[in-house]
């Protein structure tokens, strides 16, 4: 899920149901968008809104269990498949964010047919470029990524590593990854959801899954430490929810996810 700041709508595509419907939320209602062709059914894809070019970028996911590596752009009217000279290997359950300071989509990790991935890629000028860094987050999938506009850093948290759930925090400045030694942090988990909240100038994290336990906790990261928030009754515990910051309405938007009894289809605003 991503927020299209030019048109003032939240954009969502696909999901655990494996459908191929594009939905937009204008602050009042979700509306399906009709189009002639598009990315097709998939789960585990990632999306990010490129505010420099005014398009929502979608990459990968899986169809019938097979990871994908296609790149698509949604301009509000049509989905356009982008053919690039190179591309990240096929994957699902990766993480993506748009680095507004540098005008680049950042893609990290995910799960290929061969296992977890730990690579970093950037998408700009119609092409994918792999980032070769001295060190970085270990391989993982089902992690979460957001761009901190206040500190001009991409923030990564948690995920499913090769040996279990992770609870580490990393930042990326476009040149190198740095692990954050926070005094406090959410419990290790996969499938959490994260978005940078412009009003507070902090990154908000919600839910996820630790082992077999779904979570409903809410945390805020200020660039150096995590603080748990208690905003009244939160959405029910879940993992894999779609989350995006709606800058027009000043609210973090949440949709769906996997609850303790199955898939969810509820919509929440956090202000």
What do the PLM-derived regions correspond to, one by one?
Residues 1-271:
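Kelch-like beta-propeller repeat domains
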């Amino acid at each position: 899920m991503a927020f299209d700041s030019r048109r003032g709508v939240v954009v969502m595509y696909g999901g655990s149901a494996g459908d191929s419907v594009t939905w937009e939320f204008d602050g009042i209602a979700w509306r399906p968008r009709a189009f002639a062709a598009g990315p097709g059914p998939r789960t585990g894809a990632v999306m990010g809104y490129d505010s420099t070019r005014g398009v929502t970028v979608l990459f990968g996911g899986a169809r019938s269990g097979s990871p994908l590596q296609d790149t698509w752009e949604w301009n509000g009217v049509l989905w356009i498949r982008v053919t690039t000279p190179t591309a990240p290997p096929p994957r699902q359950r990766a993480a993506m964010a748009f680095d507004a300071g540098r005008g680049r989509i950042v893609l990290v990790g995910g799960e290929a047919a061969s296992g977890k991935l730990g690579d970093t890629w950037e998408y700009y000028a119609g092409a994918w470029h792999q980032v070769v860094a001295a060190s970085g987050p270990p391989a993982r999938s089902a992690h979460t990524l957001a761009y901190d506009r206040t500190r001009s850093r991409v923030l990564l948290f948690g995920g499913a590593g090769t040996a279990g759930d992770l609870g580490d925090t990393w930042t990326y400045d476009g040149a190198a990854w740095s692990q954050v030694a926070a005094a406090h942090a959410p419990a290790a988990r996969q499938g959490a959801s994260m978005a940078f909240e412009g009003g507070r100038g902090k990154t908000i994290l919600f839910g996820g899954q630790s082992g077999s336990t779904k979570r409903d906790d809410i945390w805020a990261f200020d660039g150096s430490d995590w603080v748990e928030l208690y905003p009244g009754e939160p959405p029910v515990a879940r993992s894999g929810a779609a989350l995006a910051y709606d800058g027009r309405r000043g609210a973090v938007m949440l949709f769906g996810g996997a609850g303790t009894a199955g898939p969810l289809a509820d919509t929440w605003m956090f202000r």
